[in-house]
């Protein structure tokens, strides 16, 4: 009799996705981040659910309800910090996952890639709304500043902002709707992740060489299940080290002050994972221009398949492109650093140069390097 996992309608789907899936024999640890992102998402949904049981989405009690979770709820402190730092781990895995895609040319699977970009936007939106919920100073002013950016949209901008706020400023209505959206979005992300996987399994995984691996496949289980479990253990180790030793390392001290609309913090800044985009936003002195640059800094990923001029898919055998890729990584780290600094000399000019460099590398230098490498191969 055929094994039940191959005949049962539900188990068959699981089997074809995680057990008998033919996978390339040479995918490295850079291919672990997909499963790690899945684990992060499950962890965030579970910790978030338990937090939602004790949280109140009201301006008068939101801050004290978070304090209550940390002080009075059984293991509330660990759930809260796992959720807050889990978001950081989520974004670390996301950036690594996208970086892997850029380096090894995974963006040539266009459907998978575009769903991935939508997933990135959805995750960023979710994290932003989640940051508003504790209703500390940085929550309130972060929400005010970021939502206000939409007022740069010509003609409908102001109406749009007031519609999102549910009033004439960030207030009770804003907090309530942000909580509602923050709760529903992870489930939308989970659904999109399923579609992401569906499209990936239409083509099969890429591999470090960028060459077709159809002639050399191995079953996903046990090889990559074991590998993913190791990755998961390392992820949990890193997360719990952060949670138990320095839970506030990546947070902002200002968020331990209750939100006060009458007192603006000296330096308004988002969480660390948004700082690179925030630096690009601030580097343009025009409001609309800044907002466009902010959106384009991530939307530019959609253009990657069209900017690919190389005859090879992966950067594995392309030293010039490799060099430019790591310059891009360094540039993004520079932007992250600048985003957290005050708007003064020399940070302004460094931010502007790093922003120009970012777009120049992706739009001009990397496609040029690929063309040069193509010509070098002719010799």
Curated annotation (Swiss-Prot):
Positions of disulphide bridges: none
One of the protein's GO biological processes: mitochondrial electron transport, ubiquinol to cytochrome c
Topology in membrane: Multi-pass membrane protein
Binding site for a ubiquinone: 201
UniProt keywords, alphabetically: Electron transport, Heme, Iron, Membrane, Metal-binding, Mitochondrion, Mitochondrion inner membrane, Respiratory chain, Transmembrane, Transmembrane helix, Transport, Ubiquinone
Cofactor: binding details: Binds 2 heme b groups non-covalently.
Cofactor: heme b
Record GO cellular component, one term: respiratory chain complex III
Domain of life: Eukaryota
Residues the entry annotates as binding heme b b566: 97, 196
Record carries keyword Transmembrane: yes
UniProt GO molecular function: metal ion binding; ubiquinol-cytochrome-c reductase activity
Binding site for heme b b562: 83, 182
Localization annotation: Mitochondrion inner membrane
Transmembrane segments: 33-53, 77-98, 113-133, 178-198, 226-246, 288-308, 320-340, 347-367
Assembly mode: The cytochrome bc1 complex contains 11 subunits: 3 respiratory subunits (MT-CYB, CYC1 and UQCRFS1), 2 core proteins (UQCRC1 and UQCRC2) and 6 low-molecular weight proteins (UQCRH/QCR6, UQCRB/QCR7, UQCRQ/QCR8, UQCR10/QCR9, UQCR11/QCR10 and a cleavage product of UQCRFS1). This cytochrome bc1 complex then forms a dimer.
Family: Belongs to the cytochrome b family.
Extra remark beyond the main annotation: Heme 1 (or BL or b562) is low-potential and absorbs at about 562 nm, and heme 2 (or BH or b566) is high-potential and absorbs at about 566 nm.
Function of the protein: Component of the ubiquinol-cytochrome c reductase complex (complex III or cytochrome b-c1 complex) that is part of the mitochondrial respiratory chain. The b-c1 complex mediates electron transfer from ubiquinol to cytochrome c. Contributes to the generation of a proton gradient across the mitochondrial membrane that is then used for ATP synthesis.
Name under which the protein is recorded: Cytochrome b
Organism: Cephalophorus nigrifrons
């Amino acid at each position: 009799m055929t094994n039940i996992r191959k005949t049962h309608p539900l188990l068959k789907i699981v089997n074809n996705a995680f057990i008998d899936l033919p996978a390339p024999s040479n995918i490295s640890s850079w291919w672990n981040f997909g499963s790690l992102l899945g684990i992060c998402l499950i962890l965030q949904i579970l910790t978030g659910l338990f937090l939602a049981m004790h949280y109140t989405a009201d301006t008068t009690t939101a801050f004290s309800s978070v304090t209550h979770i940390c002080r009075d709820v059984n293991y509330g402190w660990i759930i809260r910090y796992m959720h807050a730092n889990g978001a950081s781990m989520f974004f670390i895995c996301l950036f690594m996952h996208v970086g892997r895609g850029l380096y090894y040319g995974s963006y040539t699977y266009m459907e998978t890639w575009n769903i991935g970009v939508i997933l990135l936007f959805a995750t960023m939106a979710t994290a932003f709304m989640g940051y508003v919920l504790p209703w500390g100073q940085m929550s309130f002013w972060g929400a005010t500043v970021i939502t206000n950016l939409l007022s740069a949209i010509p003609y409908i901008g102001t109406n749009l902002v007031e519609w999102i706020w549910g009033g004439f400023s960030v207030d009770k209505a804003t907090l309530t709707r942000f909580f509602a959206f923050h709760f529903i979005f992870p489930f939308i992300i989970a659904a999109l992740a399923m579609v992401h996987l569906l499209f990936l399994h239409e083509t099969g995984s890429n591999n470090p060489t960028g060459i077709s691996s159809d002639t050399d496949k191995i079953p996903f289980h046990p090889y990559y299940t074991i590998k993913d479990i190791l990755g998961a253990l390392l992820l949990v180790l890193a997360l719990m080290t952060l949670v138990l030793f320095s839970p506030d390392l990546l947070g902002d001290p200002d968020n331990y002050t209750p939100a006060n609309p009458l007192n603006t913090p000296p330096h308004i800044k988002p969480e660390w994972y948004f700082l690179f985009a925030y630096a690009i936003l601030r580097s343009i002195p025009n409001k609309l221009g800044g907002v466009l640059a902010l959106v384009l800094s991530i939307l530019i990923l959609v253009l990657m398949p069209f900017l690919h001029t190389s005859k090879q898919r992966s950067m594995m055998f392309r030293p010039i492109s490799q060099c430019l890729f790591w310059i891009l990584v360094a540039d993004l780290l520079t932007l992250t650093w600048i985003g957290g600094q005050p708007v003064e000399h020399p940070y302004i000019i460094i931010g502007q140069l790093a922003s120009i460099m970012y777009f120049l590398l992706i739009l001009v230098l990397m496609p040029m390097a690929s063309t040069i490498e193509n010509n070098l191969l002719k010799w």
